[in-house]
Each structure stands twice: as C-alpha cells, then as structure tokens.
Amino acid sequence: DLERAGKRHAVITGVVEGGDPGVQAEIEDWCKAAQVRRRFRDTNIAQIGRPYPGMMDLYIDETNLYNRMFLYTKQFDWEKMWAIADDITDEDAIRAKAQEILDTFDIEGGGTIEKVWDMAKYVVAFEKWVKDEHLGMIASHYNGFAQGKAGVLDSMLIPAFSMLIKQGTACAVEGDMKVAMAMSILKTISGTGQLSEMYSIDFNDDICIIGHSGS
C-alpha cells in the first residue's frame, strides 16, 4: 500500500522480542532520524544579515528547504537585535544571566557582574528573541561598521551565541544555514553539535590551532 501510495519507506527485518541488537540498532537510527525531522518541522531557522561575501555555496533555496524539511526561514536585520536589547529592563533577569555567564566562562583577569552586565543584557535579549520567534537554528554574519550600538552588538555576538548553543540552539557564523542545520542534527542525534574551524596547521610540530567560532 505504501508503494502504491508513493510513500517512501523502509523495512526492518528481524526479531524484536529477545533483544536482537541489529534490529534494535536500526530502530534507534530511524527514531533519531524522525527526531531530526520533527525538530526541523517544529522550529524555524533564522538568518541575520547575509551570507559571507564570495561564498556562494552558502545560499539556499528557502522554498525547497521548506518543501523538503518543513523548515521555515526567517530573515532579520541586525537593527532588530539591538532594538530588542534596548527593551530589556528587568535588572533581576540581567543579574541572574550575568552570574550564569561568570559560571560558564573563564574570564581573563577575573570577571564581575558589573563587567559582564551589557553582555548579559544582550544574552537575555537573544534568548527572548529565540523564544518569541520559535527558533531552533541561527545563521548570522555581521559585515558592518563596528561603531556605536553596532560595535557593542558586534562584541557581544560570540558570548551570546555561545550561551544559546549551550541551551541547544544551533548558531553558525558566516550566515551558513547549512552548518546551522548540521549542528542541529548532531545535537539531536548525539547530544551535542559544535562548530569549529582549523585556523593554522604546523605539520612539523603536529599542532593544529582550532577556533571555536561561538561554541
């Protein structure tokens, strides 16, 4: 019937009762795949700014993505982000988030709530935005003047996205939506999904310098 209806399907052959490890492994794989599909269907992906200039493989067909994965794309400008931050006035929430930041990061020279206050405000703003827009994935790239509010925002992106990744929201740099989706898939099927880049490799000393890119 599935064949005649044109529905894609798979058949698992084996014995469930008695603990057939092969059957159990196949069932678990299909369950993980279903979890990924459900996560894509039940959340949205956001793109802030535009993809990194010159990297044309980063652009995607939003219509095709929705038709295949039921994943809806929401486009945002950076002005939206600092506008949200301007509306954050709950000092108790900011203070609690500042303490969470201090508990999460090792800050060179020592950190205080006062030192990370602005950072905490932006993290609270980003968390509110993720909740309001029902986001599971974010791809961003800032290519503007790092002055005024824009400069403050630019300096807050890595810690803000790091905190979101910690909470399970996939955040990719360079506006790479495909990497954001890959991070989300890894988070769903294996418990964590991180983004890193190899900046330099010393073959003589067998050293590889890896940047965390927000994770």
Model-flagged regions — what are they?
Residues 64, 68-72, 118-215:
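Anaerobic metallocofactor- and corrinoid-dependent redox/one-carbon enzyme cores
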Residues 18, 22-25, 40, 56-60, ...:
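Conserved active-site and cofactor/substrate-binding residues in soluble primary-metabolism enzymes
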Residues 28-31, 48, 109, 121, ...:
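A near-ubiquitous, low-amplitude feature marking generic local secondary-structure context
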Residues 1-98, 102-105:
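Cap/lid and interdomain-hinge subdomains that line or gate substrate/regulatory clefts
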Residues 17, 51-55, 84-87, 109-116, ...:
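Hydrophobic alpha-helical scaffolding
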Residues 97-127:
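Active-site loops and adjacent core secondary-structure elements that bind or stabilize anionic groups
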